[in-house]
Amino acid sequence: QVSSAASDVYKRQVLFLLGILYYGVDDDGQQFRYLGVLQRIAVCYLFGGLLFLNFRWRGLLLSSVLLLGSYWALMSFVEVPGHGAANWEVGTNLAHYIDTQYLGGYKWSGDWDPEGLLSTMPAIVSGILGIFGGMLLKNPNLTGSMRAIWILAIGGACLGGGYWWDAYASLDYN
């Protein structure tokens, strides 16, 4: 399992470096973009893969709940220096503050970047949801129709949960 973890890390490093090579430098060649889509995929794939190698489905579920709960708590309760109380508004929230203070380089759109540091937490959970889907599809104890029923039921529950959760933590991409 050590070689599998080492291989997992190596593949993600290559993907991260490809993202830096592709997205890394602005048009003037003066500033560097540290995080982009490929880098985000590499980070999520790395953490998801390492969690998958070390935990069963309950550990993955607990990791997902902890990541989303921590993200929500940070965004909802941590005061943003220079902007006052915690908020979810683009440009004044904690994720933007952390990216501005610690990420450096140029951003995707002015002073904002959708692939930031703090916002990677829920993105990792999206990767873990994909792992759950793969685990369900590869389960030898389920027939094809039972897999379809489970996927529809879980998808419906996630949609309902997301609709309910939107009242507490809005889903903003822009």
Describe the function of each predicted region.
Residues 132-174:
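Long, well-ordered mid-to-C-terminal structural blocks that present hydrophobic/aromatic surfaces
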Residues 15-24, 68-77, 156-166:
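Aromatic-anchored segments of alpha-helical transmembrane domains
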Residues 34-46, 121-129:
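Membrane-embedded alpha-helical segments of multi-pass membrane proteins
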